[in-house]
Amino acid sequence: MDIKNNHSQNPHACAGVGCDTDGWSGLFNYSRREAHEVNVGDTPLGGDNPIRVQSMTTTPTADTEACVDQAKRIIEAGGEYVRLTTQGVREAENLKNINVRLREEGITTPLVADVHFNPHVADVAALYAEKVRVNPGNYVDPARTFKKLEYTDEEYAEELKKIEKQFVPFLNICREHHTAVRIGVNHGSLSDRIMSRYGDTPAGIVESCMEFLRICKREDFKDVVISIKASNTVVMVESVRLLVDTMRREQMDYPLHLGVTEAGEGEDGRIKSAVGIGALLADGIGDTIRVSLSEEPEAEIPVARHLVDYITRRAGHT
């Protein structure tokens, strides 16, 4: 195969990041994509900051002691952000207690609330966490039913207005409380609306994210991180590259969070994460990563750090 010709025919093969026009320098020289800086507590990401590593607690977020203990283990292992699942208002409100306990011990590591299905929970979490993750697939759209729905252009536009009506007040809360936002798309939870128009495709995954990013841009809300995750590493890599290219064409430079869902445990989980995350890091894409393993959360940190160090050591190498 003529690699040069193949690359030139595929505009998303590199998305203009981490390689030159002939597609070869990215194999030997790391060059990171430019992204604007996002403030997440006292640990900003993007810009000239190092690639941040993070993990996620597995303890019930309503259990303050368990969450604090596990967060400390993640932080002691080198985690720079700690994410906590936030299923309901009770869990969102308890983020305050977890945050206070850690700060009392002199720990300032930012906490990230992971919210699904309930916009009101995101509003509450934004009061107490340094960053809130929302999933476009279920933020306003109902839970996926796998039904084929038909929308006229007018009906589709009305659905987008519903998202904006709910999302803009959330952004205003985040702006007031200096809370960052992650727009985190999961391949497995695309809405029926997106699926009906775009199918189960990278284009649909990207559009699910872009709908929210366009609102952020209109509202001049810059403290946004984005992610696209899939258990299939090929789908993940293709979708993220397409997202980067789409943002470039729409003059956006939001930083990216990288991760592979359901990576597993042991050697298999590490290899799967290295394939998906490593390919994108080699492209110069990625400002924070989480290696998702079916193990204790602190076990994820050394793997993530090794992956980042391996790729970034190539900077300036010729």
Residue positions per predicted region:
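Conserved, mostly hydrophobic/aromatic
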Residues: 53, 114, 183, 226, ...
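Non-cysteine beta-strand/loop elements that form the S-adenosyl-L-methionine
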Residues: 131-138, 180-188, 256
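Active-site mouth loops of central-metabolism enzymes
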Residues: 31, 40, 47-66, 85-87, ...
